[in-house]
């Protein structure tokens, strides 16, 4: 039996196989997964909001369980407005866990009715990060096996020097 709704927020700059792994595992557990492409004022994304949303759409196609949304404010406010009580985060290592525990405590303070769940990333993707992918691309390195195959050229094209 599946559960209700969950939100999976992130910058997804770019969308990786680690993100996809967590997303599909959430879709196996929940009836509805909102993947939230965040507007993060503390980061300067390589890809625009629309590019990031389109990347995810290209990978998942039409999927009744997964809805791609954009949040420019607090995720807890979006959760309240849409009656979402669970926020999910992927955890690669203890550094992620430390950061995410602090964030979950703050989110709980802002929205006491919510809970945060943590999914360990599959060991194949424990080292994958959007930052690492961008660093590899700066030196024209291969990103196959790090991002969905259908996105490799789209992502690489952003880094080709003109």
From Swiss-Prot:
Residues noted as binding substrate in the record, renumbered to the chain: 11, 43, 75, 89
Keyword Cytoplasm: yes
Site entry (Transition state stabilizer), positions: 19
Predominant location category: cytoplasm
Catalytic activity: (R)-4'-phosphopantetheine + ATP + H(+) = 3'-dephospho-CoA + diphosphate
Record-level GO BP terms: coenzyme A biosynthetic process
GO molecular function, a single term: pantetheine-phosphate adenylyltransferase activity
Enzyme class: transferase
Listed EC numbers: 2.7.7.3
Annotated binding of ATP, by residue: 11-12, 19, 90-92, 100, 125-131
The protein's annotated pathway: Cofactor biosynthesis; coenzyme A biosynthesis; CoA from (R)-pantothenate: step 4/5
InterPro entries in alphabetical order: Cyt_trans-like, PPAT, Rossmann-like_a/b/a_fold
Known cofactor(s): Mg(2+)
A Gene Ontology cellular-component term: cytoplasm
Source organism, top-level taxon: Bacteria
UniProt family annotation: Belongs to the bacterial CoaD family.
Role: Reversibly transfers an adenylyl group from ATP to 4'-phosphopantetheine, yielding dephospho-CoA (dPCoA) and pyrophosphate.
UniProt protein name: Phosphopantetheine adenylyltransferase
Name of the gene: coaD
């Amino acid at each position: 039996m599946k559960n209700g709704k969950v939100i999976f927020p992130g910058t997804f700059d770019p969308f990786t196989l680690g993100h996809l792994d967590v997303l599909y595992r959430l879709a196996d557990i929940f009836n509805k997964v909102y993947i939230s492409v965040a507007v993060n004022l503390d980061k300067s994304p390589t890809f625009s909001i629309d590019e990031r949303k389109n990347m995810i759409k290209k990978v998942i196609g039409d999927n009744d369980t997964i809805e791609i949304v954009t949040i420019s404010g607090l995720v807890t406010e979006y959760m309240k407005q849409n009656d979402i009580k669970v926020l999910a985060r992927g955890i690669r290592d203890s550094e992620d866990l430390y950061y995410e525990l602090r964030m979950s405590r703050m989110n709980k303070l802002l929205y006491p009715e919510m809970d945060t769940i943590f999914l360990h990333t599959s060991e194949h993707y424990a080292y994958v990060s959007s930052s690492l992918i961008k660093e590899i691309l700066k030196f024209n390195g291969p990103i196959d096996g790090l991002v969905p195959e259908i996105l490799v050229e789209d992502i690489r094209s952003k880094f080709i020097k003109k």
